[in-house]
Amino acid sequence: MNYSQLKPARLNLGWSQQQAAAHLGVTQAYLSMMERGLRSPASVAPRLMKVYGLSPTVLPVNEVRDEVSADTLAHELALLGYPGYAHLRKGGQAGNPASFLLTALGQRNLEARTAEGLPWVVLKYPDMDSTFLVREARTRNLQNRLGFTVTLGRRAANRSDLQPLEQQLVDSKLEKEDAFCKELNSAERKWLQGHSSAEARAWNLLSDLTPSSVRYV
């Protein structure tokens, strides 16, 4: 979380430091130091998000997980506000969307409805830490999957603000053919080799997802 967000968020609520500190459960002196960048807000980030009404992008990025159940990922996407999973939103707190996105993209077999929701995450949270996203995607060889996700979102909503992130991923695109979050049998692979979308082929991926597949834009 960038400390420079704190003072504008407080002032937007019309609160003095003393009032905000009381809502946050910290001292005025501690809040003052956080607003000046002298103390890290990471330990109170969830409280800041709730009290100030900030985006979950302010939360610390968590470790990218390798194997996560389909139900867990669906619930986490619901907590981020995905309309398609509104019925799963009860219980729990949203995590950092960048951590969720990379975790989902790294799954060997991601549930199709969850995969369709990933471009929505990119559109909903354009302020995700792009440095973290690109670095971790490259580390895990996920840049093509992430790039495809960004392309789908950008074209579905005509969002030029996503082009810088997309270009960073283009610059490190992998040449090896991959499937989008799904292990394919030989019949599925053969079919998708002839029916993958232009956007997927541009990222050397096998997938029939298109910008028109992106919902809730």
Give the ranges of each region predicted by the language model.
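Helix-turn-helix/homeodomain-like alpha-helical modules used for DNA recognition
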Residues: 64-127
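Short basic helix-loop element that most often maps to the first helix and adjoining turn
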Residues: 4-23
